[in-house]
């Protein structure tokens, strides 16, 4: 499997279970690209929604994608600390067009003090019925929520001290 090259600018595409495009993040710079992990950075980029709306992110962010985990993170650097928006979704794929994953609705927001909140359970329940998520998928996603919470408590991966700050310093070299 090929993977995005360090320093290259890519798009990130999220899809829904039914195969429809959900969201596109533009102009994201790859800081580390391997077959197992992609770390990327962006700042005030355009995000295109499937319904045609566009919006711009408000702050710099470090993005973390894992080829073996059913979650990814957007680590937002704000004046009062780092906020983490964790998406439950498939492990990433890379196909030269974009880094891609399927978004499965559930999210965990983590605050600078490492408190967290599980979001969008109602959206998950609705989409699981509408798009007929198989029972095996529910098992995988529930286990992934537990694994993600474990990472947060253990300060693993992007939650480790200095992880985001160190990658942000690398990102600034490419801006």
Curated annotation (Swiss-Prot):
It is an enzyme of class 3 (hydrolase). The active site is at residue 23. Keywords: Hydrolase, Magnesium, Metal-binding. Mg(2+) 1 binds at residues 87, 103, 107. Its EC number is 3.6.1.15, 3.6.1.6. Belongs to the Ntdp family. Has nucleoside phosphatase activity towards nucleoside triphosphates and nucleoside diphosphates. This is Nucleoside triphosphate/diphosphate phosphatase. It comes from Shouchella clausii (strain KSM-K16) (Alkalihalobacillus clausii). The lineage of its organism: Bacteria, Bacillati, Bacillota, Bacilli, Bacillales.
């Amino acid at each position: 499997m090929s993977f995005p090259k360090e320093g290259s600018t890519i798009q990130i595409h999220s899809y829904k279970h039914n195969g429809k495009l959900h969201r596109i993040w533009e102009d994201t710079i790859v800081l580390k690209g391997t077959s197992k992990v992609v770390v990327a950075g962006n700042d005030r980029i355009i995000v295109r929604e499937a319904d045609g709306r566009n919006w711009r992110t408000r702050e710099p962010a470090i993005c973390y994608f894992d080829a073996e985990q059913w979650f990814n993170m957007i680590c937002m650097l704000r004046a009062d600390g780092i906020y983490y928006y964790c998406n439950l979704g498939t492990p990433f794929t890379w196909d030269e067009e974009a880094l891609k994953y399927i978004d499965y609705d559930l999210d965990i927001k983590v605050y600078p003090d490492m408190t967290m909140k599980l979001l969008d359970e109602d959206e998950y329940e609705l989409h699981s019925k509408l798009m007929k998520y198989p029972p095996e998928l529910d098992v995988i996603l529930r286990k992934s929520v537990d694994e993600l919470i474990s990472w947060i408590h253990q300060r693993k991966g992007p939650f480790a001290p200095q992880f985001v700050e160190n990658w942000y310093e690398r990102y600034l070299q490419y801006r």
